[in-house]
Amino acid sequence: MAKRLLESSQNDQANRKNSKIEKKEVSFYEEEETDDSFDSFYQDEEDDLSDIDWEEVSLDGSLTVTFGNIRRDREKVSKYKRKHNKKAFNYQRLKYGLHLIMIPFMLFLLKSRMKWIDDERLNRRLRRSVPKLIGKKFKDWDVRDPAFKMDSLRTLLLGLVLWFRSNYKMNSNGIRQNFNRLQYLIKYADNQNENSISESTYKKVLENQQEFYGNRPLINHGVEDIRKMAKRKMANRDILTLFFFIILENVLPGPKKLYLCFALPLHDYDIRCNKVKWQIEHGIGKVPNRFDSDLIQPYFWIELEVPTLSDGELYIIDPIAHLGEREMVLKTREDQFVPTYQPSVDMKYNLNQKFHYVVRINHAEKVLQDVSPRYVPNVCYRYFELSESSPILKSKHYTSYQYLSKWLKVLNKKKASVHHYAIMKKIALTNFTLPKSVTEIKRTDNFVIPSLLKSNEVLKACAKQAATFTKGDNSQEPIFWRRDVIQLKSKQHWAILGRSILPNAQPLKRKKYLPMRERMVRNLDKYVIKELFSYEQTMKSPKYPSTYCDHLGQEHVITDLSHYKNKFGNIEIYSKETKPDGFELIPLSKEVDIKCLIKEYNKGKRKMQKIKYLDVVSGFDFKQKKGHAIPKIESILVKETDYKAVQLLKQQTKVLLGLSFWDILLRKLRVNDRLNAEYGNVGNNEETLDDH
């Protein structure tokens, strides 16, 4: 009996330990918040109470609860919140910046790998490594009829892959991303000097990158090192894919198109880490072995097209990573989605690998092409026909895609294929999954429901329902494509952007809001109604008129600046294109005080000879004073005739300033010479005294 009780207590303790471990594992990673304000991106590690074992206590009798008024210093709390929000914002911005800046480096890496494939000595060595029997099979296949060739090509390619796997071995880690290390280095960069332990841990993580990325081979001598790997028939799985690419190019006869595909291992800005410090200190995130078995999918694979056999047929070959024969050589159509290459997005099972883009490069023409829709789902937003008012244009995902597209144009130095773009668009717009929760709708750039529209957003009149969303309370709401959402702005906002509302344009929405100034003084009654318009309801702001008509209908040229003065005593010019003819803008600078020069000039002049100017408001500063829009005055407006006079004053002032500096320098030199002549050189006198 005692033995049974002892065993049961031990089992209970073990179960409690396992439950604690499971809790910790679940709370390590979270998806990033969708709010663009970046208010909370990681939770405080000391505030996590999930690991506390709560004890049940029976309550006999009454329970008295006393509420106390806890006074907190508002200014201190506000200062802490501002500091925390600023740190969180910088943390998220840095993660996104790393994601963007890695794109060109990864594209250059793909182009450099393709240059190795053209090396003649490397081709000769790999070609000779193929047995004559395999070469004979490919030659016999080449002379058969097209129907037989089309049916047997996959079998032939599969045999070549199996031979390659049995003869070429993996001996080191390939290219990979490490979420834990990057998150730690970003998040605790400012905290490494708190104590000696934090400093040593941070330094160790920074310098010992092989623990987090593996022991990758050093390629100091370029293709010469690759030749040595081919000679030993040992490399990492990325280089081995290049070897198979070269072998396939040399063995497969006839016209063909070979592409090297690369899933860009970019930094994932959509995930946040709650306990990254604890994980680093406990060795979580280190590479387990040199075979990269923790990486679910490959980063490099091959696409093959044989136009003479079948137009639109595509063979996708992975000679290294996949275990199933179907995934090793997959026969499909070029307009079909391939789901087997997208890593799992479940953060419990996969955090070390996730890719947003797949880019391929042609062996013959060395042209880079984006083939992401073939392998990555839910990228419809990249191929939407968007209006200028679409909020998708400002999303992080779409901005990242535009950045990739720009670099592809730069590296290709020519326009992308229209046919290829049409195929990718067709795949993208048909390969999507409907969101199942409100959180998923908030995260996606493809869909939206009316209840999640912002106060300055509205659906197009022609918007069509894509599906129906069922909420938790069994109520239903229509799902629309996010491309049908229009972002609206007020008249003042459009004016700042250099656009004016079209005549007879009716507001698409009216927004009721409480100005910040009224909120600060707790005046909750003075609401303001703003009319909101779309981009399509605006036009470029016209120029200020340069003429006016008097009461007799005669037209006169405007020469008086007071004609443009508003009630605040200035003129609003947000774009140089709206500047009235006959007048010029003079930028204000710290070097020369233009306004002071004009005032000094006007002192001795008659009224008709004086230079008149008008302050120009070119925008507003909303951060200088909370709740206020402080106008930015960075230039003044003067008549064209006065413009030349002001420029002459500026030139004369600069000359006088230069001469005054020379005068000061010469006076100092004269004083120095006089002191030396009368009292001698102080340094020489001290040396003379020391000698005596």
Curated annotation (Swiss-Prot):
Protein location: Nucleus
One annotated Gene Ontology cellular component of this protein: nucleus
Keyword flag Transcription regulation: no
GO BP term, pick one: mismatch repair
Listed Acidic residues bias regions: 28-38
Major localization class: nucleus
Keyword DNA repair among record annotations: yes
InterPro entries, sorted: BHD_2 (IPR018327), DNA_repair_Rad4 (IPR004583), Rad4_beta-hairpin_dom1 (IPR018326), Rad4_beta-hairpin_dom3 (IPR018328), Rad4_BHD3_sf (IPR042488), Transglutaminase-like_sf (IPR036985)
Region (Disordered): 1-38
GO MF term list: damaged DNA binding; single-stranded DNA binding
Keyword tags: DNA damage, DNA repair, Nucleus
Further remark: Present with 78 molecules/cell in log phase SD medium.
Family designation: Belongs to the XPC family.
Functional summary from the UniProt entry: Involved in nucleotide excision repair (NER) of damaged ribosomal DNA (rDNA). Required for the repair of the RNA polymerase I-transcribed strand of rDNA.
PANTHER family per the UniProt record, alphabetical: DNA REPAIR PROTEIN RAD34, DNA REPAIR PROTEIN XP-C / RAD4
Protein's name in the database: DNA repair protein RAD34
Gene that encodes it: RAD34
